[in-house]
Structures are given as structure tokens and as C-alpha cells.
């Protein structure tokens, strides 16, 4: 039995027979990690021992458009303060800005009037500008694909994440109490935008996975109480999910770091059936999640990246921990986040080889 990457993905998530599990083992290292690995023998021009199963992922189509013009506001020896493409004023380190947390100084929306102008100017479903003038040809070409098509709305595709991107974390949390009507107006606009975008996309191609993005939890729990979040977000999730299902999108995913146990029932009630990345250091355990919530919830991620910084024995133990899910199906084993610079290159190579053995052990 031999399947292409699309058939394998679909069969795996349908709990049907596969030739092996999906392999997503390619690294996502920090910039500092790459610098270390190059000193340890990594050559970025050479192919990896086991290339990932193919997947077409688009995660930039839903950002504010037109993007804000990057404008430098201040600069010193170590940092730079600027307006980014989302309209956020942020201060970043000059060395390795992608792997250090910026300081967020101002967000693009502070008032209703600013939000309504923002929505009018940058929440337009203009595919010819977001994808390209030949968007019809691009999307239609995916009908002949041999791997899954995954469309992620990323930072603007959620009912906490999208609000947070406009007003900041603290204001997003307080709006649930201080101005729920304004919060609902923003949530409804996000839902409208997601539906309008996807309604145009599915005219030209089917889609395997649509992805929400939230990142709304820290180490011990969510930033908003589950009951309160259910009240506001569930109706909007359901509206988008019901629309997507009516257009044939079978798998609806959601990405949130942190400890999300108390939010999972909300997302399942909305019809979301794929979650990731299950950060182990935040207490998430994919084996426990499967036992508690069952096979209707598909997953990817859940392998503790910190094991790669320890030893081969730690890597072996971590892969043994998730092995039952690999055998059961509906799960793609991969790291729970990008690889920090305390991971030796040899340890990554060992992990990749052992992961390859695991996905072929069915």
C-alpha cells in the first residue's frame, strides 16, 4: 500500500488505513539555533535525511491589507522602535528580533471610530491584492494537488487573537467587562471577514483545513475565563464553522499556545476538530487530551521540544509517550514549538531519525 501525501493526510484524520503516519519532522529553529547548528555541521544547502510530507500552507492572506508602511520612530544601539505591517508600534532588539519578545507600545485601534475606519480600509476581501492578480489561476491549480491544502487565518483569524491584534492583550481582556458591545462589534466583523474571504476562495478550490488562531493562554490557563469566553466567542465560531462545513471544509483547526484544557470544550462545541500545538511545558498532554475528549478531536504537535536539549534517552522517552496516539490515528507527531538554541544539532538529527522510525512503525 502506497499513498501520496494528500491521501495519507486524509486517511489519517479519518482513522482509515495508512501506509505510515504523516511525517512533519523538519526543524523550525530560532535564528540563534541556526547559528549554533552551522558551527556543529549543519549545511542549509543540503537536503534533510527525511523531507517532510508535502503540504500547501497559506497563512498571510488574512492580515490587514493594505499593510501599514513600516516607519522607524526611534533607534538606539540595541533596539529599534517602529510601526509594523499590522499598525502596531513596537520596540525590538536588533540582534535576533524574531526570537525575542518585542515591547508593544501602541496598537492600531483605541476607539470605535478607529476600528470602523480600520475595518473599512483593511478588512476587505480583495483576493487580487491579497493573493495576486492571477488568484483564480493560483487557487484553481490546487484542485490537482497531491498534498493537503491548509489555509490559516493566523493572527487575524480568531475572536481573541484578532481583537488582541487590534487593541492589545490587556485591553482585549478588559473589554469583556468594560465594553462588551464594542467587543462584539469587533468579533462580528472578524467573522464577517473570514466568511467573505473563504466564500471567495472555495469558488476555485476545495480546502482540507481552515485554521483559526488565538494564542490566548499562558502556563496555567486562559487569559479569559472559559464561561465568559464561551458566551462571547462560541456564537461567532459556530457561524464561521457552519459556513465552512457548508462549503465542504472538513477540518477546522485552531492554534493556541499555553494551557488550553478549559477551552477545549468550547471549541469542540463550535465544531472545531483539530487543535495544536499542545505545549508540554504549559501542562498539555496529547495522550491525556485524547482520553478525555475522544477521537473527534484531531491533533498535531505535543512533542516536548525541551527533550531535544537533554539527551537521546529523553528523546526516546518523549516519542514513546506519544506512540499510542500514532498507532491510533488522528494525530501527527511533531514538536510543540520552534527549536531554541540549547538544542545541539546532533540531538535534532537523532530526533528526526527516531521520529521517522515511529511514523513508519504502524
Task: Name each region found by the language model.
Residues 17, 55, 74-76, 144-145:
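Short, solvent-exposed loop/edge-beta patches enriched in aromatic
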Residues 1-30, 81-83, 92, 114-362:
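Active-site loop segments of alpha/beta catalytic cores
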Amino acid at each position: 500500500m502506497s499513498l501520496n501525501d494528500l491521501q495519507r493526510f486524509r486517511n489519517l484524520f479519518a482513522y482509515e488505513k495508512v501506509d505510515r503516519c504523516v511525517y512533519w519532522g523538519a526543524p523550525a529553529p530560532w535564528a540563534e539555533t541556526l547559528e549554533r547548528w552551522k558551527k556543529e555541521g549543519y549545511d542549509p544547502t543540503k537536503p534533510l535525511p527525511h523531507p517532510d510530507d508535502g503540504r500547501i500552507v497559506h497563512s498571510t492572506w488574512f492580515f490587514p491589507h493594505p499593510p501599514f508602511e513600516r516607519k522607524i520612530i526611534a533607534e538606539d544601539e540595541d533596539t529599534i522602535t517602529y510601526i509594523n505591517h499590522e499598525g502596531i508600534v513596537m520596540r525590538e532588539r536588533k540582534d535576533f528580533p524574531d526570537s525575542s519578545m518585542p515591547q508593544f507600545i501602541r496598537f492600531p485601534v483605541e476607539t470605535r471610530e478607529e476600528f470602523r475606519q480600520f475595518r473599512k480600509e483593511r478588512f476587505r476581501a480583495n483576493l487580487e491584492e491579497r493573493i495576486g492578480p492571477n488568484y483564480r489561476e493560483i487557487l484553481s491549480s490546487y484542485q490537482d494537488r497531491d498534498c493537503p491544502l491548509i489555509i490559516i487565518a493566523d493572527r487575524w483569524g480568531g475572536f481573541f487573537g484578532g481583537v488582541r491584534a487590534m487593541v492589545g492583550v490587556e485591553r482585549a481582556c478588559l473589554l469583556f467587562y468594560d465594553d462588551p458591545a464594542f467587543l462584539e462589534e469587533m468579533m462580528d466583523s472578524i467573522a464577517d471577514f473570514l466568511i467573505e474571504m473563504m466564500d471567495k476562495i472555495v469558488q476555485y478550490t476545495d480546502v482540507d483545513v481552515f485554521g483559526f488562531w488565538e494564542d490566548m493562554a499562558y502556563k496555567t490557563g486562559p487569559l479569559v475565563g472559559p464561561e465568559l469566553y464561551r458566551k462571547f466567542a462560541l456564537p461567532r465560531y459556530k457561524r464561521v464553522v457552519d459556513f465552512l462545513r457548508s462549503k465542504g471544509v472538513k477540518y477546522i483547526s485552531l492554534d493556541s499556545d499555553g494551557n488550553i484544557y478549559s477551552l477545549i470544550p468550547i471549541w469542540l462545541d463550535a465544531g472545531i476538530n483539530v487543535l495544536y500545538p499542545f505545549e508540554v511545558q504549559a501542562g498539555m498532554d496529547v495522550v491525556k487530551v485524547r482520553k478525555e475528549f475522544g477521537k473527534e478531536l484531531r491533533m498535531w504537535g505535543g512533542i516536548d521540544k525541551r527533550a531535544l536539549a537533554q539527551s537521546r534517552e529523553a528523546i526516546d522517552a518523549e516519542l514513546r509517550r506519544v506512540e499510542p496516539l500514532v498507532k491510533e490515528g488522528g494525530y501527527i507527531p511533531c514538536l510543540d514549538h520552534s527549536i531554541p538554541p540549547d538544542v545541539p544539532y546532533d540531538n535534532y538529527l537523532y530526533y528526526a531519525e527516531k521520529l521517522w522510525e515511529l511514523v513508519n512503525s504502524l
